[in-house]
Regions:
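A hydrophobic alpha-helical transmembrane-helix feature that marks the membrane cores
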Residues: 1-236
Length: 236
């Protein structure tokens, strides 16, 4: 007989984990949008649009942050994961503000954040019925519909359409790929120590953010390789 057998951590359920991870990602996107609005509209800092040195500095800071968070991820507690999400959201917002217009920044973060907010509602209402990755198809569909509605309402140009739809696909695919890893991590944490759903959700949200950033860099590197290969072939 186990005297203290009744003392056990709450089982981490997949639906709870999805809902909270989606809300954390939506909150991160909202924070990035707020940073863009603060820099480009409220403070109207000309340095973010006139000086290329700011862009270079933010890109370097972005790479350092990604590398540091990736290396430290396995040892992160709840507050560390939240801090990582806040840091990524703030630096991402500053970098977006240095590269794009305020409208484009708000559209991109609004579409992506709205997609995850809708994903949280979908998971909360129908999560138990969604099997075999159907949740992520619905997540992508919700993001796609949101992107179409917002771009039609704002009469967005081609770049705005393509970028917003690209982010929907990117974050949906990365979320689907990170889902088994996130659930396995939750099971492992449950077996080893006392944990909360919030702990697993913040780590899951951070892993999706890091995965999306890494995937974007891989795509960018591939495109640069293809362009350089094409230009070298043409020069011959």
């Amino acid at each position: 007989m186990r005297v203290f057998g009744w003392i056990a951590p709450v089982q981490v359920t997949p639906v709870e984990l999805l809902v909270k991870a989606c809300w954390w990602l939506a909150a991160g996107m909202a924070l990035s949008a707020a940073v863009c609005w603060l820099v480009l509209d409220l403070l109207a800092l000309p340095q973010f649009t006139e000086h290329s040195a700011i862009i270079v500095l933010l890109v370097i800071l972005w790479f350092i942050t990604l590398f540091a968070l990736t290396m430290l991820f396995d040892r992160m507690k709840t507050l560390h994961a939240i801090g990582g999400l806040v840091l990524l959201s703030v630096i991402g917002g500053l970098l977006a503000a240095s590269l794009f217009s305020l409208q484009l920044c708000l559209v991109l973060y609004g579409v992506t954040g709205g997609m995850f907010a809708l994903g949280a509602l979908i998971a909360h209402l129908y999560g138990e019925r969604l099997r075999n990755g159907r949740f992520y198809w619905l997540l992508a569909a919700a993001g796609g519909v949101l992107a179409v509605v917002i771009n039609l309402a704002l009469e967005g140009d081609t770049a705005q359409w393509c970028t917003s739809l690209f982010l929907v696909v990117l974050f949906s695919v990365v979320s689907a790929r990170k889902s088994p890893e996130m659930l396995d991590s939750a099971r492992g944490l449950y077996r080893q120590q006392f944990v909360t759903v919030q702990h697993c959700a913040t780590r899951g949200a951070l892993s999706i953010w890091l995965g999306a950033a890494t995937a974007f860099l891989d795509i960018l590197q591939t495109l640069m390789f293809l362009v350089s290969s094409g230009s070298s072939s043409a020069s011959r």
